[in-house]
Amino acid sequence: MDKEVSELVVLQLIHTLISNKNEELVRNGGGINMIGNNLRISLVKLTNEIQNNLLINELTNLRRQSNVANGNRKLGINDILTIVKNLFPEYRTTLNDGQLSLHGLEMHDIEKLLDEKYDRFKKTQVEQIRMMEDEILKNGIKTGASQLQPHANAGKSGSAGTSATITTTTPHMAHSMDPKREKLLKLYRDTVLNKLESKTGNFQKLFKSPDGSIIKNEINYEDIKNETPGSVHELQLILQKSITDGVMRKVIGTDDWKLARQVQFELDDTVQFMRRALE
């Protein structure tokens, strides 16, 4: 994992484990997890949490699939010790009988550092996303060595000696595909939409209050319903972007925001259903 991500993971789990332990001690009538003014945590438990956490493993696997340098290795005990010392250079850390002690460190120090590092990481990621959006708007979406451009391959259908192909334009890009493949993708699209809309009907409600000042290039529901996606994955991407737009469009906690979050769960269920059906 990247240095920033590794620090956030270790810091968050330290905070979580100490908080959980303190709550347990308080419930049992004891004090907080400290000796004098020193916070304590089991290094073995911290390492196991990091190495076996489902979300962390998913992040590591995604970075491995993306061939991210130094992003596909799990953190070991020595890595964690180094990170802890780098996180708290002004505090002495000792290791005795598997217990990692943070001398003079208090919970509010951990919380303050966690907030600072999260805010810094978030700002960096937002800026990178903004740069990527500008690049995509300027140059289009690149896939492999080729770059997909609107209306590409138009006019190639009906070539002599080859089966007819159809150029199908979606709101995002053009596709040249075999009619049989197009028919299957249309069937898949209709099945997914019917399954998604049969749950609560909330999906269509996401498109009733567009806001171009917040979301660039919002997707139109009729385009999703009538255009043929280039692949199963592209349809999922389009649906996911529609929901993400709905989440980003509204203030956290509002009814519309909650609706978009609910649709996210419905999409996840629908995707799992379709995967099982295809298998």
Swiss-Prot record:
Q: Where is the composition biased (Low complexity)?
A: 154-170
Region (Disordered) residue ranges read 147-179
Signal peptide feature range: none
Transmembrane segments annotated in the record for this chain: none
The record ties this protein, via InterPro entries, to: EAF5
Recorded coiled-coil stretches: none
Alphabetically sorted, this entry's keywords are: Chromatin regulator, DNA damage, DNA repair, Nucleus, Transcription, Transcription regulation
A single Gene Ontology CC term: cytosol
Biological process (GO) annotations held by this record are: DNA repair; DNA replication-dependent chromatin assembly; DNA-templated transcription; nucleosome disassembly; positive regulation of transcription elongation by RNA polymerase II
Cellular location(s) = Nucleus
The record's misc note reads:
Present with 937 molecules/cell in log phase SD medium.
Protein's job: Component of the NuA4 histone acetyltransferase complex which is involved in transcriptional activation of selected genes principally by acetylation of nucleosomal histone H4 and H2A. The NuA4 complex is also involved in DNA repair.
* Family indicated by similarity: Belongs to the EAF5 family.
Oligomeric state and interaction partners are given as: Component of the NuA4 histone acetyltransferase complex composed of at least ACT1, ARP4, YAF9, VID21, SWC4, EAF3, EAF5, EAF6, EAF7, EPL1, ESA1, TRA1 and YNG2.
> What protein am I looking at?
Chromatin modification-related protein EAF5
